[in-house]
Amino acid sequence: MAYDVARVRGLHPSLGDGWVHFDAPAGMLIPDSVATTVSTAFRRSGASTVGAHPSARRSAAVLDAAREAVADLVNADPGGVVLGADRAVLLSLLAEASSSRAGLGYEVIVSRLDDEANIAPWLRAAHRYGAKVKWAEVDIETGELPTWQWESLISKSTRLVAVNSASGTLGGVTDLRAMTKLVHDVGALVVVDHSAAAPYRLLDIRETDADVVTVNAHAWGGPPIGAMVFRDPSVMNSFGSVSTNPYATGPARLEIGVHQFGLLAGVVASIEYLAALDESARGSRRERLAVSMQSADAYLNRVFDYLMVSLRSLPLVMLIGRPEAQIPVVSFAVHKVPADRVVQRLADNGILAIANTGSRVLDVLGVNDVGGAVTVGLAHYSTMAEVDQLVRALASLG
């Protein structure tokens, strides 16, 4: 069955506000099924998992279900799923627990293309424990991380490499396979942030061979919950515990505080939403995710191609980067018009976009020196008619 965008739009009552939402890189709209699930779960699962009473058992079941749902999302073992408030929080906890990998004589590699959530924790850990920091640089023409640089960056002293699988600012997709092999050859770990790619691509931690991956549920319309997943759950034991519970085991060793069980129920509902984007999808949740994400990808590729052709038709618009592989996210500048003014003009026309994402890559490319960049991204409910509205509003700036 073809992707039915009208049906998908019907799953999001908030689209009734009349706004055109091209601000997907900041998080997609919450489907009604997720909002309803969260509300119901907060009424039923308010207690912690400690105890033998029904509410505690329901909370424990919600926690288990959330780990299983995230595991299906990334093709992993539920025993390796760590849950928390946000991927930035989880990565900070992981970095805090990584003293054995960030000490004197060791090296940590981070990327200029990443969100700050996957940079700042490792910089702090390196400063605290004495490791040397190396940077994977961006090709200023394409906006990608060139694969040739990994051989010169990775050494016997490398203990950890942190990268994203796709940029939430430029949209470029990172080639992970060659890099992960080099990293593993020296006994180091690879931490991959999938937050930008998760709404658009079927994730597979085994296929990329990453050791740890992170996602943010709000990226695809889930609640504000992050997940950090270990390909091999036993690797968690090589990190120090950050839990306030001295008896914590497994994922709980890297979790702090009491879980928000209502939000965790929403994570499950949001992954079910992804698995049902294509009504024809059948089978296990992982199988339904594979079908639905493929259908969504095919649809969004058509809309994104139309968006790119339309933007290139505007003489004052300059696209930033030319990645070969791309999620449906793009940044651009408008000649002699600051990004915040462009975004305000779009808002005046009922269109939401993002001015200056805060990514270091915009500084590297010199974009912030000439007024900054506007970032737009498609969501599962985006249409070609909305692209036309965006282009008309941008054309009015000329």
UniProtKB/Swiss-Prot annotation:
Gene disruption: observed consequences: Cells lacking this gene display impaired growth.
Gene3D superfamilies given in the database record: Aspartate Aminotransferase, domain 1, Type I PLP-dependent aspartate aminotransferase-like (Major domain)
GO cellular component, one term: peptidoglycan-based cell wall
Cross-referenced Pfam families: Aminotran_5
NCBIfam families assigned: am_tr_V_VC1184
Family from the record: Belongs to the class-V pyridoxal-phosphate-dependent aminotransferase family.
Purpose: Is essential for optimal growth.
The name this protein goes by in its record: Uncharacterized protein Rv3778c
Upper taxonomic lineage: Bacteria, Bacillati, Actinomycetota, Actinomycetes, Mycobacteriales
